[in-house]
Amino acid sequence: MIKSELVQRIAEHNPHLYQRDVENIVNAILDEIVAALARGDRVELRGFGAFSVKHRPARAGRNPRTGAHVPVDQKSVPFFKTGKEMRERLNRDTGAPDSGA
């Protein structure tokens, strides 16, 4: 599902809202999550999961084509950890065994 499909589905389930208003709300939520992560904050949505930033140290990499060693700079990457309720629902709905993670 892409963002436009998400907006459309939310608008269909909430006929009292205009689709452009739903799109503005979804964009505002996503913008706030990104802004919080950029500040170094953790964003927790109970039952859904938590967004955070993980910092990867600089390391030596390898060019797969030439085999030459190349330095890889340190970087920050977004990380998402699913909430307990989401994990339970996904495992219940798919019939997959609970990994306990």
UniProtKB/Swiss-Prot annotation:
Span-the-membrane segments of this chain are none
**Gene Ontology terms for molecular function:** DNA binding; structural constituent of chromatin
Sequence segments annotated as region (Disordered): 58-101
One GO BP annotation is:
DNA recombination
Compositionally biased spans, kind Basic and acidic residues:
82-92
Give the matching PANTHER family. DNA-BINDING PROTEIN HU (PTHR33175), INTEGRATION HOST FACTOR SUBUNIT BETA (PTHR33175:SF5)
What family does the Swiss-Prot or TrEMBL record give for this protein? Belongs to the bacterial histone-like protein family.
Name of this chain's protein: Integration host factor subunit beta
- Organism of this sequence: Rhodopseudomonas palustris (strain BisB18)
